[in-house]
Amino acid sequence: MALSKPMRYAIAALTRGTEKVDIKEKYELVRQLTRATHPQLLKPSYRPWDHTIQCGDHEVPVRIFTPDGEKRRPGSLLLFFHGGGWVTGDIDSYSDSCIMMTRMTGCSVVSVDYRLAPEYRFPAGLEDCYAAAQMILQNADTFGSFPEQVTLIGDSAGGNLAAAVSLLARERGGIVPSRQILLYPSTYNDHNPETSPFESVRSNGQGNMLTAQRIEDYMALYRSDEADLQNPYFAPLLAQDLSGQPETLVLTAEFDPLRDEGEEYGRRLANAGSRTFIYRVPDCLHGFISLPGLPAPVREAYRHINEFLDRAKAEPPTKSAVDTGDC
């Protein structure tokens, strides 16, 4: 099945100017192009609130988005880690995505402006996200929420960070979030089509918005040294023990090179005892949650996100399966 023409046009508009730039040599240019192609166009119901969270000797900026009162899901908060390969993206370029997230879910959204590579390599961005998560989970009432109603959510590199934050919380004895939503996450350490165990790297790794080579380049900028490639907080799929993790929703994109590793991470979470739901969004490329205008894949994704947030925890965990239903 080929990607539909409307989706090709939408993705092309979203990534114009960035797809052919050498990210390793001109990452700052890619950041500038990303900001230019992701202006805030949506008007929030309420003015966002900028705040900072202490992390060691520095402060981490966060931006809080509040939903319309009539559509609000009382007490529910999404802690959002943006994508961009750990190298690009910020709370400004993701403002529209967060505004849409509040509209579509009724949740408050806290977006974390973690430090970016290569100026701040692994685990700097992860530590920022962990500090933000622990502060918000410990002080959820300050944000009008409760610890059990705080859900981690991240797309792409942000999905990687959300998974790693949950693992780190368990290992450090911190508060493990009750839920996490991983949107087309990066979970593995090898995206070479010749050596990767995942077929989607080969079938989807060329000619699309996100290529296998671009993923390898992002990881080269993110890691501090070669040893990081074997670190489960760098590549969560390498974790030997996935017990004690949150209830999880994994959403992947049909034509994404990261598709198979995201789904495999969901399956392993389920096998380790976490209640896990996996859904593959058809006719979609990587990064679809940021598409403007609510195209069908984005509406479908939010349908699953809302079902996940609404779902009663009383149901027993079942073996995870990949849903490939139509949009």
Residues of each region from the PLM?
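An N-terminal hydrophobic leader/cap segment in hydrolases
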Residues: 4-52
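Alpha/beta-hydrolase superfamily serine-hydrolase fold, recognizing
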Residues: 6, 42, 47-54, 58-327
